[in-house]
C-alpha cells in the first residue's frame, strides 16, 4: 500500500511550488531554484552518488533572518517560513523526475527550528503511507535553537542532528552568528548532551574553516577544551571541518588553506576527538554549504539582484513584554509571518509574533509559567 501511495503522490500531486525556474548541474549534483506561488524563491540541491545513493538538501524558509556573517542566505533576510507542502514538494519534484529518495537533510535555506512546519514535514516524510522514510535517513542542521532541539529529542529521537558550531568561544561566535547571544555554546552543548543521553545517537558538529578568523592552532586548542567539558558524551560527538565556500556577497570571508585545515584537524584528532575534513560538492554552481541565496538571473546580474534584496531589508525593534529589553530583527519589506516563535535573548521568554510590511506585533505574550523561568 505504501509504494502505491507514494506512486500516487509522485504522479498526481499538485505541487505548491509554482514553478521550477532554474536548474544547474555539475558532475554529482543538481541545484534547482523554485518560485513559490507568491513569488518568493527557494533552492534545493540533489546529490547523486556513483553508488546509486541519492541525497537531497532541502530548504525550510525563503531567506533567513539570523544573519550569520559567512552565509549567502543570511544576506537576504527572512522572507517567510515555508508551509509543510512547500517543504515536502521539494522532494516530490525529484520523485516526479524518477529519482529514488535515500536521504534528506534540512541544510538548505533557512533555520529549520525557526519554522514550526518542519515538524509537520517530518511527520509526512516518515509516515509509512506517504514518503515512508526512516527517521535515520533524515538530518536536521541547526544554528542552536534550544527549544527545537528539545522537541526533536522528544518527538523524532532517531532523526540525525547537526549543530553549526563554527567557533570555539562565545565571544568569537557572537561576531559570526548573532544567535549566540540568545543560545550560548554551553547551553546548546548541554542540550545536545541531553539529546545523546536520551537517544544514544551521534551528534554532528559543523565547523567552517575561515582564514585568520577561526582556524589557528589556538582556536583548535580552545575547541578541544570546549568539547572536553562534555567528556562523558564525547564519543558520540563527531566534528566535520568544512572548507569555506566564498560567495560574491560574503567576500570578506576567505577560506582557509588545505594545509591549515589539515594542521587544525591534526590537533583535534590527537586530542582523541572524532574529526574529519568534509568533501565539498557543488561550489562551482553555488550549491555548496552557505551558497544558497535564491539567485535567479545570469551570473553577471546576480550581485545586482542581491544588493537590491539587501536594500529592501530593515532592522526593526521588538520590546519584550516581560523584561522590557529590545531585540533587533532583520526583516524584508515583503516579509509576512504569522505565529512566528521568538525567544527574548535576555529573559528567554517565548512569544508569538506577527510581521507584515515592516510592522511587528506580539500576538501571544508569554504565559505565567514561561515568565517564571
Question: What positions do the PLM features span?
Answer:
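Residues immediately within or flanking Cys/His clusters that coordinate Zn2+
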Residues: 61, 65, 286, 315-317, ...
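Short cysteine-rich clusters marking metal-coordination/redox-active sites
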Residues: 68, 320-323, 344-347
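Radical SAM enzyme core and accessory elements
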Residues: 1-13, 270, 280-307
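Flexible, acidic/Gly-rich N-terminal and inter-domain linker regions that tether
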Residues: 1-54, 306
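Conserved AdoMet/S-adenosylmethionine-binding subsite of the radical SAM
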Residues: 94-103, 108-271
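Cys/His-rich microdomains that often coordinate metals
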Residues: 68, 75, 327-329, 351-353
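Canonical Radical SAM [4Fe-4S] cluster-binding loop centered on the CxxxCxxC motif
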Residues: 48-86
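Short, intrinsically disordered terminal segments enriched in charged and Pro/Gly residues
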Residues: 307-317, 331-335, 354-373
Amino acid at each position: 500500500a505504501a509504494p502505491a501511495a507514494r506512486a500516487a503522490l509522485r504522479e498526481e500531486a499538485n505541487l505548491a511550488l509554482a514553478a521550477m525556474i532554474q536548474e544547474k548541474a555539475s558532475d554529482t549534483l543538481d541545484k534547482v531554484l523554485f518560485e513559490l506561488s507568491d513569488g518568493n524563491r527557494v533552492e534545493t540541491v540533489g546529490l547523486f552518488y556513483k553508488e546509486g545513493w541519492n541525497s537531497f538538501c532541502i530548504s525550510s524558509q525563503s531567506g533567513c533572518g539570523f544573519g550569520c556573517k559567512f552565509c549567502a542566505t543570511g544576506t537576504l533576510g527572512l522572507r517567510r517560513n515555508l508551509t509543510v507542502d512547500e517543504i515536502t514538494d521539494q522532494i516530490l519534484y525529484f520523485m516526479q523526475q524518477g529519482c529514488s529518495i535515500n536521504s534528506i537533510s534540512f541544510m538548505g535555506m533557512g533555520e529549520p527550528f525557526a519554522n514550526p512546519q518542519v515538524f509537520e514535514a517530518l511527520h509526512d516524510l516518515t509516515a509509512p503511507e506517504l514518503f515512508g522514510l526512516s527517521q535515520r535517513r533524515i538530518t536536521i542542521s541547526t544554528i542552536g535553537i534550544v527549544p527545537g532541539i528539545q522537541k526533536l529529542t522528544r518527538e523524532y529521537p532517531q532523526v540525525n542532528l547537526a549543530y553549526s558550531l563554527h567557533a570555539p568561544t562565545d565571544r568569537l561566535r557572537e561576531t559570526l552568528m548573532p544567535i549566540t547571544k540568545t543560545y550560548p555554546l554551553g547551553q546548546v552543548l548541554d542540550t545536545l548532551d541531553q539529546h545523546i543521553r536520551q537517544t544514544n545517537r551521534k551528534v554532528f558538529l559543523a565547523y567552517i574553516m575561515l582564514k585568520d578568523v577561526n582556524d589557528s592552532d589556538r582556536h583548535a586548542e580552545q575547541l578541544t577544551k570546549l568539547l572536553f567539558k562534555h567528556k562523558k558524551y564525547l564519543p558520540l560527538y563527531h566534528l566535520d571541518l568544512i572548507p569555506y565556500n566564498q560567495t560574491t556577497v560574503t567576500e570578506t570571508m576567505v577560506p582557509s588553506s588545505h594545509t591549515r585545515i589539515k594542521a587544525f584537524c591534526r590537533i583535534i584528532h590527537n586530542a582523541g576527538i572524532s574529526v574529519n575534513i568534509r568533501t565539498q560538492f557543488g561550489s562551482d554552481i553555488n550549491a555548496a554549504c552557505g551558497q544558497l541565496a535564491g539567485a535567479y538571473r545570469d551570473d553577471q546580474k546576480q550581485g545586482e539582484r542581491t544588493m537590491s534584496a539587501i536594500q529592501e531589508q530593515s532592522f526593526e525593534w521588538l520590546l519584550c513584554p516581560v523584561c522590557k529589553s529590545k531585540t533587533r530583527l532583520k526583516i524584508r519589506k515583503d516579509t509576512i509571518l504569522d505565529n512566528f516563535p521568538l525567544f527574548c535573548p535576555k529573559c528567554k521568554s517565548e512569544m508569538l509574533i506577527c510581521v507584515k510590511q515592516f510592522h511587528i506585533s506580539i500576538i501571544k505574550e508569554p504565559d505565567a509559567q514561561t515568565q517564571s523561568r
